[in-house]
Amino acid sequence: MRPILLSGHERSLTQVKYNREGDLLFSCSKDHIINVWFTHNGERLGTYNGHNGTVWSVDVDSKSEFMVSGSADNSMRLWKVSTGECLKAWEFPTAIKRVSWSEDDTKIALVTEQRMGHQGAVRVFEINRDGGPQPDEPLLVFNPIGSKAQVVAFSSLDKHLITGHENGKVALWDVNTGEEVASKEKNHIGLITDLQMSADRTYFVTSSKDKSARLYDSRTLEVIKSYQDPQTPLNSAALIPGKPYLLMGGGQEAMAVTTTSARQGHFEIRMWHVVFEEEVSRIKGGFGPCNSIAVHPEGKGYAIGGEDGYVRLHHFDENTFRAKPYGHETEPKELD
């Protein structure tokens, strides 16, 4: 399971994202650019230039027609995937930390940062797909009370928005009114770093700086399963479609690690059994924390965006899922 090492960024990766078919991988970074790669061989297909700050988040629609990005230059941009043309740029008072397409590809949700006297906000824009002009004003704006939102996603059938917050809170919001429908505040006790939906959006997984990941029901926000890592502050967690496993990764901040050993910094990617809540294997990471994990939509492999500036493209082999899901007496096995 040796990865293909993709070198196309000069600074740390912030997010990696597959398209729906899994033949393309998008990566964004602190070097202001977005790259798109072929997943079967790791060849770079193109680059999207236009942002003037760290690109924090990227998402692509289900038809691979439009891509959206959010940046520290206080702008969100809509791109045509096939040509690299920027179709629209929206300006905001603060940085955009997360962008997310709706299930029906007609809306984009984004989270803006709380900074310089500006409240953190969640906005929803309706996207014109027929070639006409894009709206300047959002369909919905609301300011989460209390802890600021870090991540956002649409729930099943786009009925609600789900947000993860700085204090570990997870909340459900009415997509039409912006009213809070439900919230859970005690499950995570640290900043929520990532939130990824299942394929049908009926459940989702979160990762947190409190060294845990949680599996939630999208409708009720009830915690279905919990995965507590004793060592690693987590930056990302992702479910493997069609398999009862999830991947999670993170690591100590690079500057806090006294040696370059991946083991010393806990940079390995951990595979857990979703049902039994058991760690089954570890996969060697890079020379620094894992900042983002994305899994192929068909469960064929996964991609890692690292603090070291590389994208690592892994393809699962036939032995990957033969690890004992529970009852093992030894340490989880380590895969190359």
UniProtKB/Swiss-Prot annotation:
It comes from the Eukaryota. GO terms for biological process: cytoplasmic translational initiation; formation of cytoplasmic translation initiation complex. It is found in: Cytoplasm. Pfam families: EIF3I (PF24805). Component of the eukaryotic translation initiation factor 3 (eIF-3) complex, which is involved in protein synthesis of a specialized repertoire of mRNAs and, together with other initiation factors, stimulates binding of mRNA and methionyl-tRNAi to the 40S ribosome. The eIF-3 complex specifically targets and initiates translation of a subset of mRNAs involved in cell proliferation. Component of the eukaryotic translation initiation factor 3 (eIF-3) complex. Belongs to the eIF-3 subunit I family. This is Eukaryotic translation initiation factor 3 subunit I. The gene is TIF34.
